[in-house]
Design a protein with these regions (language model features):
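Active-site-adjacent helix-turn-beta-strand microarchitecture at beta-sheet edges
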Residues: 26-47, 78, 86-190, 228-280
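Well-ordered alpha-helical segments embedded in enzymatic catalytic cores
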Residues: 58-62, 99, 125, 195-199, ...
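Generic enzyme active-site microenvironment
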Residues: 39, 82, 215
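Short catalytic helix/loop segments, enriched in acidic residues and glycine
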Residues: 51-65, 105, 188-196
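Signal peptide-proximal N-terminal region
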Residues: 59-77, 204
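Short, high-confidence coil segments that cap the C-terminus of an alpha-helix
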Residues: 74-76, 109, 208-209
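Gram-negative bacterial Sec-dependent N-terminal signal peptides
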Residues: 2-22
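Domain-core and long-helix interface of multi-subunit machines
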Residues: 193-239, 243, 258-261
């Protein structure tokens, strides 16, 4: 599918072998098949381009096909977005991305991380987009300065095959310096890794999920070499206690992260071909 050339990563979490926590709804020593589909950096491309690329109609065709295939194998699907729905196509920008969010509803997105480009518009526009969307906008590290309260839900809970899955949202703290400063007078972007530690602790104490994953808009930088950018997914994964997160599905840097072998990234990846995700021990 040509629209896969921009921002679509399919991360398959084929099975959870959950055997460590007692008194849960799942059966001990049973393998559960849960497929996690993830897209990021959509940037207003709800419409198919003149080159046959992009378009939410094509994306729905693909997602529906995968859902059917997974269901036939007895599995379940969770569909996440790494954010940056906004900014890129005038047909979207001039409508405040309403077609994009309504299209994502039809595809069946479960949750979305808030991206930096969501703040290319005033907060009032973002709140309207939340009303259009039938899925939660997640970010644990964006706060309102005047109240000290988070602006968005930090997490969402989903149940797939009796498995309780917590999804945390996180946003790059670079947003404040790369966005329009007039929109941030009462908004604070805290360090995502530090907020992740707090949220994971809160989840384990209060919600007791079987699995915790993060959908982020922070960027992936090889070996954590983020340069002048704020730290991304790799640095956060290394800063957290082992086993804190089962998976990170991210966006922002828009680089495919496909592994040829352990600790060896695949070079010259061709969109649409198989992509083995990275494992950070």
């Amino acid at each position: 599918m040509k629209f896969l050339k921009r921002g679509v990563a399919l991360a398959l979490l084929a099975a959870f072998a959950l055997t460590t926590q007692p008194a849960q709804a799942y059966e001990k020593d049973k393998t559960y098949k849960i497929t996690i589909l993830h897209t990021n950096d959509h940037h207003g491309h709800f419409w198919r381009s003149e080159y046959g690329e992009y378009g939410l109609a094509a994306q729905k065709t693909l997602v529906d096909s995968i859902r059917k295939e997974v269901a036939q194998e007895g599995g379940s699907v969770l569909l996440l977005s790494g954010g940056d729905i906004n900014t890129g196509g005038p047909e979207s920008d001039l409508q405040d991305a309403e077609p994009d969010f309504r299209g994502m509803n039809l595809i069946g997105y479960d949750a979305m991380a808030v991206g930096n480009h969501e703040f290319d518009n005033p907060l009032t526009v973002l709140r309207q987009q939340e009303k259009w969307a039938k899925f939660p906008f997640l970010s644990a590290n964006i706060y309102q300065k005047s109240t000290g309260e988070r602006l968005f839900k930090p997490w969402a809970i989903f149940t797939r095959q009796d498995i309780k899955i917590a999804v945390i949202g996180l946003t790059t703290d670079d947003t404040a310096k790369i966005g329009n400063p007039e929109y941030f007078t009462d908004i604070e972007f805290r360090k995502p890794a530090e907020e992740a530690k707090v949220v994971i602790q809160e989840l384990n104490m209060n919600e007791k999920p079987d699995v915790i994953i993060a959908t982020t808009h922070m960027g992936h930088y090889d070996n954590g070499d983020h340069g002048s950018n704020a730290p991304g997914d790799v640095e956060m994964a290394r800063s957290l206690p082992a086993g804190s997160l089962a998976m990170i599905v991210g966006g922002h840097s828009q680089d495919p992260v496909c592994m040829a072998s352990e600790n060896k990234k695949q070079v010259n990846y061709v969109p649409g071909t198989p992509c083995a995700p990275r494992s950070e021990e």
